[in-house]
């Protein structure tokens, strides 16, 4: 966190407010590997699995209780420039899918253009299969570990409430409103009916 304190509590659960940049301890720190400010860099430890859904394709679900505030998974893939993402995005749109995730934390904070995007099409982790929900149980945070460039955060997903075993893991894609191109199948009571 910017204040110099840990973004996590004693149980390793996020305590930083949404939108707060998270700076974890790294190779430049004198602390040990078990430092409580080294959560995302330890990797996946949440009890999750990939499964097939009826309407949304592949998805991810909890296999055991995930307590609120717990780190769940990092969105990984190939880091590309935004210009390359625009080119690839046209192809992906024509094919009816996209696994592009803009690394726009710095641009959102300082009003500049987003420089990089993660493409999880060919190189990816489990987070590629997280689906949208209008009432999500995960929220993404920008996390910096060894790379201090504000343009290159890591994207980490944390539970925003307790997640029951068998429950699908979701986040809000936050697509721009106005279009009516892809129906939403999240099933939430507050469903907006359309992704974009």
Each model region followed by its residue ranges:
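Catalytic cores of histone-lysine modification enzymes
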Residues: 17-18, 27, 38-147
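Beta-strand-rich recognition/accessory modules
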Residues: 153-158, 168-176
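Eukaryotic modular interaction domains in large regulatory/scaffold proteins
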Residues: 137-164
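Accessory low-complexity/Zn-finger-associated flanking regions
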Residues: 1-58, 183, 189-196
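Short, Lys/Arg- and Gly-enriched loop/turn segments at beta-strand edges
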Residues: 79-85, 177-186
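Generic structural signal for buried aliphatic residues
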Residues: 66-72, 163-170
């Amino acid at each position: 966190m910017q204040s110099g304190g840990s973004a996590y509590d004693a149980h390793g659960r996020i305590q930083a407010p949404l939108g707060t940049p998270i700076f974890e301890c790294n190779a430049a720190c004198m602390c040990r590997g078990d430092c409580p400010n080294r959560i995302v860099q330890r990797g996946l430890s949440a009890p999750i699995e990939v499964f097939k859904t009826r309407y949304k394709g592949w998805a991810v679900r909890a296999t055991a209780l995930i307590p609120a505030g717990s780190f769940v998974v990092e969105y990984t893939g190939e880091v590309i420039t935004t210009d390359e993402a625009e080119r690839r995005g046209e192809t992906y749109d024509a094919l009816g899918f996209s696994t592009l995730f803009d690394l726009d934390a710095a641009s959102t904070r300082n009003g500049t253009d987003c420089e990089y995007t993660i493409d999880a099409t060919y190189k990816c982790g489990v987070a590629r299969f997280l689906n949208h929900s209008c009432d999500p149980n995960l929220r993404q945070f920008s996390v910096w570990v060894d790379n201090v460039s504000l343009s290159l955060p890591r994207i980490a997903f944390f539970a925003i409430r307790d997640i029951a075993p068998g429950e699908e893991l979701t986040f809000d894609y936050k697509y721009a409103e106005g279009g009516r191109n892809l129906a939403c199948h999240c099933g939430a009571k507050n469903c907006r009916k359309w992704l974009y």
